[in-house]
């Protein structure tokens, strides 16, 4: 399957709030590859952690599963026929592309993609929940409730893998991180106009927490073991384990 190049913000004009519509879906995989530092490496690291924590016949849920890339790559690395993979997203175009990709890779029997509001997540006895670069799009006042739902959904010993764009409350350092990320995107072919217009479109949509704010949120809802497992400047990944009784 050939993915189209992300050219959404190439033309000057007033930027509308970013949304996961059909236009974004067409270029989403390219957008991720060029906009999220070490995206593939984070999935690889996630797979290594899951390999050590998943039990027989566990289910893995990906909230905000988009085009299914994360789950498909996890299944390729894990090579576990007993694991069920469930992608949840509110975007019909995203789900349609995810289902098509799963069929193309002959993964249809092991995968399901559900159209649901992840803020109402209520599945039970999950072995793992993945939340990569998704929580940042949920309104801050709703995040604690979402985390409580995820915590309740996990079996004892189940894991949450969370990746987020983060903010530093040290203003000078935060400016440095933003500048480095700006150059990262330029190196991957985005123009100054594209970078500026996307930043404006995301301004009131993507609201990052700091590393400590994310960790404290996880601990507040009941997770006892919370650790960072990947960081690139203002992008961070966390693992949280639900305690055994």
From Swiss-Prot:
Pfam families with a match to the protein in the record: Methyltransf_25
Keyword Membrane attributed: no
Keywords, alphabetical: S-adenosyl-L-methionine, Transferase
EC number: 2.1.3.-
A GO BP entry: tRNA wobble uridine modification
Catalytic activity field: prephenate + S-adenosyl-L-methionine = carboxy-S-adenosyl-L-methionine + 3-phenylpyruvate + H2O
InterPro entries tied to this protein: CmoA (IPR005271), Methyltransf_25 (IPR041698), SAM-dependent_MTases_sf (IPR029063)
UniProt-listed Gene3D superfamilies: Vaccinia Virus protein VP39 (3.40.50.150)
GO terms of molecular function: carboxyl- or carbamoyltransferase activity; S-adenosyl-L-methionine binding
NCBIfam families from the UniProt entry: carboxy-S-adenosyl-L-methionine synthase CmoA
Family membership: Belongs to the class I-like SAM-binding methyltransferase superfamily. Cx-SAM synthase family.
Function of the molecule: Catalyzes the conversion of S-adenosyl-L-methionine (SAM) to carboxy-S-adenosyl-L-methionine (Cx-SAM).
Subunit structure: Homodimer.
Protein name as catalogued: Carboxy-S-adenosyl-L-methionine synthase
Primary gene name: cmoA
């Amino acid at each position: 399957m050939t993915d189209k190049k992300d050219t959404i913000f190439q033309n000057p004009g007033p930027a509308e709030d970013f949304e996961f519509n059909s236009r974004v879906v067409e270029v989403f995989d390219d957008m991720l590859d060029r906009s999220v530092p070490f995206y593939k490496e984070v999935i690889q690291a996630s797979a290594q952690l899951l390999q050590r924590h998943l039990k027989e016949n566990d289910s893995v849920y990906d909230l905000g599963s988009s085009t299914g890339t994360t789950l498909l790559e996890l299944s390729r690395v894990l090579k576990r026929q007993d694991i069920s993979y469930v992608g949840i997203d509110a975007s019909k175009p995203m789900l349609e592309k995810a289902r098509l990709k799963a069929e193309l890779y002959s993964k249809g029997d092991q995968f399901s993609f559900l159209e649901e509001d992840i803020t109402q997540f209520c599945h039970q006895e999950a072995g793992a929940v993945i939340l990569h670069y998704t929580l940042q799009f949920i309104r801050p006042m709703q995040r604690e409730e979402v985390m409580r739902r995820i915590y309740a959904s996990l079996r004892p010993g189940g894991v949450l893998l969370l990746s987020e764009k983060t903010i530093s409350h040290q203003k000078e350092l935060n400016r440095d991180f933003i500048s480095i990320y700006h150059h990262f995107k330029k190196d991957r072919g985005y123009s100054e106009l594209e970078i500026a217009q996307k930043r404006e479109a995301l301004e009131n949509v993507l609201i990052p927490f700091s590393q400590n704010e994310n960790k404290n949120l996880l601990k507040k809802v009941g997770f006892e073991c919370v650790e960072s497992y990947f960081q690139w400047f203002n992008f961070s990944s966390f693992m949280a384990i639900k305690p055994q009784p």
